[in-house]
């Protein structure tokens, strides 16, 4: 992809040079050096034939004496030269290119260039330069190319480049610079190409490049940049090519890009973008090529991500292992788009609406994707499809199993239905995620289907979050992104994304761990988890505990001592996440019970805490009923007869609306308070922490939770 003018130009020059024959130059030549007439291209790409003295790789410690007076190009690369005096080069009046790269210079002042007024190109890359003082290149008024890359420069004085008003190309990449000073560029009004990547600068400040009104190509690759300030590119009205390759940009620098309206080539490859959102690339009227490749975190290209790019002809979005979703309406008003490269991603399909939105599209690359050959990709085999597949024999179906490994273009049209289930890509978000307490969490869930699916999330507490939901902590965006602000340990647990349409649904779950894991696998059971007896009564016991962070589920079991000897049943309650107490009821008086709390955590390990408790002996008030089974039986019989009479009376009329008609009577043992003859299970939605006199609880989003329909209300 032609994103950077300078590298391509240099590659073209090298290729063209290799094709032109080298002619011997018959002059007295220094020992072991080669004197020839070679093709040469000026910094403005004009072709010339230059008299060349090649003394590369000769282990020289000084410039050879008695060089031919007509030398135009002097190559001294890969030697051990540490100093160049004026007397060694001053007599070479025609010298236009000097290559001193890969030598041993540590100070630019060790190079005396005052007597080289014709020099156009100077190579000092791959030396040991550490500083550039003011006026370091005085006397080089004609210089157009300066290569200082791959040194150890950590300081450049404000006027280091004074006198270089004709400089066109400056290479400062791969040094030790920590800041960029706009005063450097005040001396370079005609600079067209600046390569300053590979320096771990702290930040690019507003108007850092403002003096460079004629700059056409700017390379900011490999600088560990996390953000670009809104006015960092202010003043670059001539900029055509821009590279942010291999940085740490988590979002597209939209405001900064607005400052370069003439941009034609943009390279954002190898950045940790998670999504390209609406309007991230909008109204860039001259953009021709855009690269969004090799992004490990990229999940989706959302609706209207690319809007009003009238000159865009090629879009590269390749080698993104988690990119599983391109919205059907991701592209709008891209009339000149010809080539769409989407190979080697995690895409299950490319929607027909996406293709139809690109009226001039000629070819698309989808090879290397896990294509699901169903209704969404059906357009590929429709008659009259104008779009050509790049590498069609490598564009294969991954699903369904009976079409696996079959080229997409060879699947019969009738094999693909009109409607299909939603599919959430397994790579859209990881199975588990650790978040520091107090930070924000963002999860992206996307799905393609026909009809278009609805997406919502379910929290560990069972709260359903839809795009219409906007609480204090949670927010769901229309395309399925869940944002949780200021995460606490209470929000840890399983989050489920649900994508559904009229055909069916698909789900995907992520386990969220908040903060440092307090509980690690392999620790002794019960360590850090304690079950306490808060209150004991003749027929119920109140237990409490402190729920550790990152809890996924909590189960409480209890049984009497006789049950442990095989003479009774064990009861089980599945408790909602966040429950801190439970009231065990329907117990026998003066009886020992064994209760155990089992907690499961997000990292798949569990902990167990147990406690013994004994119910109190019933008082006279309790014995009035508790010790007189005959009286209880009479009362129960009376209740049964009353219920039967009431049922017979109601049976003669119509069922009451809104009540549901007749309901079956509960089993007889329920009236005596006896335990069920098998394991008693209390479902999670019907259990809440026991708190006498409590008001109706509310969720973290302010929604009222109904009280449990059990004896623990």
Swiss-Prot record:
GO terms for molecular function: signaling receptor activity. LRR repeats lie at residues 70-91, 94-115, 118-139, 142-163, 166-187, 190-211, 214-235, 238-259, 262-283, 286-305, 311-333, 336-357. Residues 1-18 form the signal peptide. Disulfide bonds join 445-497. Residues 422-511 form the Ig-like C2-type domain. Keywords: Disulfide bond, Glycoprotein, Immunoglobulin domain, Leucine-rich repeat, Membrane, Repeat, Signal, Transmembrane, Transmembrane helix. GO terms for biological process: cell adhesion; signal transduction. The chain crosses the membrane at residues 631-651. Overamplified in malignant gliomas. It holds the Pfam family I-set. Residues 652-713 are cytoplasmic. Residues 19-630 are extracellular. Residues 369-422 form the LRRCT domain. Coiled coil: none annotated. It is a single-pass type I membrane protein. Residues 20-69 form the LRRNT domain. GO terms for cellular component: extracellular matrix; extracellular space; membrane. Glycans are attached at residues 94, 381, 555, 583. It is found in: Membrane. This is Leucine-rich repeat neuronal protein 2.
